[in-house]
Amino acid sequence: MPDKHAFLSPSSAERWYNCPPSAWLCEQFPDLGSVFAAEGTEAHSLCEYLLGVYLGRKDLTDPRPGLQYYNEEMEECCQGYVQYVTEIIEGFRKAGESPAVYVEQRVDLRRFIPESMGTSDCVIVGGDQIVIVDFKYGMHPVPATSLQLRIYALAACELFSALYDFESVRMVVYQPRIVNVDESSMSVNDLYAWAEQDLHPRAQSALTGKGDYCVGSWCRNCRARRQ
């Protein structure tokens, strides 16, 4: 289940990547949260439970009795997510692979983004490919090329490259409430080149408060904008 966001969190990457000084500016204002964020957190906890049950885990507690925003729509969305993930898993198996599956996997982003950690919804490794699936319960469209997902893909490669021999990264956004399922792929080498040449320098600028303010679509969730 997602936990407290890091200073340079993947979820806010679109903002601090494009407008580095906004990272420290937003620290001056409280994060008041929202009903939408609370709904998303609860939906993620249900996804984690349902997918864990499918994978045969016996140590899980059904979160539904304690979910404030649980309803039929949330159940259908989370069940759909599990079905989609299982289809990816079965696809690997039909190809003769034995995929490894990691649910709500804690990842370390600090090599490229100082002081940053995160949690990836689902990581699947099979053959020469690693797949990162990002569940979105919100209504704002999110593409598979989002910085958040690319950063989680990078972190997954960092974590699992010593265990598995994969060459390509497949990034998937599953956003059921607006019927958005989007995919993007790239080579591991290209992902690391982007991280070293682009992501890391921008993260350093954000951490030190350098760079220029820049207005764009990433201002939508900026805390400073709301003041």
Language-model segments: residues:
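Cysteine-cluster motifs in flexible loop/terminal segments that predominantly coordinate metals
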Residues: 19-23, 204-227
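Active-site-adjacent bridging/hinge elements
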Residues: 16-22, 122-132, 195-198
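Short amphipathic alpha-helical face segments that pack within enzyme cores
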Residues: 42-45, 147-155
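Non-catalytic accessory segments flanking enzymatic or RNA/DNA-binding domains
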Residues: 100-101, 107, 195, 199-204, ...
